[in-house]
Amino acid sequence: MFSLYNRFTTQGTLSDPDEVPDPRFALPSTVNWMRALSILVQDRGLNFGSASSFYAGTQRRVGTAQEENTIFEQLLFAVHQLSALEALRASPSKADVARVGIVGWYYGIYSAASAMIAAQDGSIQDDHTGTATTWDRQFAANNKVMAPFFYRLSTLVRKDFEVEVDTLRAGNGFLLTEKATDATEAFGACCSYLSGSADWWKWKTEQNLKSSREFKVLNVSDFRTKAARTLRDVRLTGKSTAFLHQAFRYRGKANYREALFLGYGKSTETLLDGYPDDLAIVLRGFVAMAGAFVAKRIGQPLWDEFLDDIERNRSFSLSPKTVWQ
């Protein structure tokens, strides 16, 4: 009997010539991380009010018109993505909207983080990795991020980041294989995804290193020699994993995984129960946090004018005042 699952996982495709990853194992962790974040956003009461209190000591910065416009542009992008996710929550089929939901979620996070960076120092980065690194350096590494978006690891050297994960867990052994039901389990799930993301970024960094001149000079194909390991660890040391790094990896689940993922299998719809809701709840929390920081940074009068203008002229259904007021 013809089966895409059997064909893909045993014969591979042109892009995955060996075999494609088995979606049965990847889908639960995808859903369970977002559920964990959703639980923690609600448990911590993350909204514009609590974020405004968190950023109460933030000093105002006077930027140029172009810097201010970049901030406003990125926030408009973010709230528009949130409006889309709120609309997706009403879909009777969660599998219909899961893939586009992930993409909308990521770009909402990315735009909100870009607005924070522009408000902080008047810059905008050229690529997603640069944005993730800059956001971590300016915010997460300096305790300027609220839970559950502040979990981070300071290195990609496995033996070192594993110690950091163990310290962060403090004995919480809950894994992503199960769906969290309370804040304690959700925290454990977030630790698991953070660890997995660090491992993924480690692998990605190693692959890039193998293409470098420094590695090719060693005339090796892996990191088994002492010289290769030393070169690798120098590259991995000081490279962090923070929330935007995790979000970047997460986006790839929608953009770059095989078609079986999210789109094949009779159990998929059941596994996705509540998933669009979780995407929207988490994005709303992050966008609220970003807006609260920006409001403090640009000052209340300009913030109110920005908010009123979107409210008058928005083409999408979500009122920004339900997020940022």
Where are each of the predicted segments found?
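Terminal alpha-helical segments
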Residues: 1-325
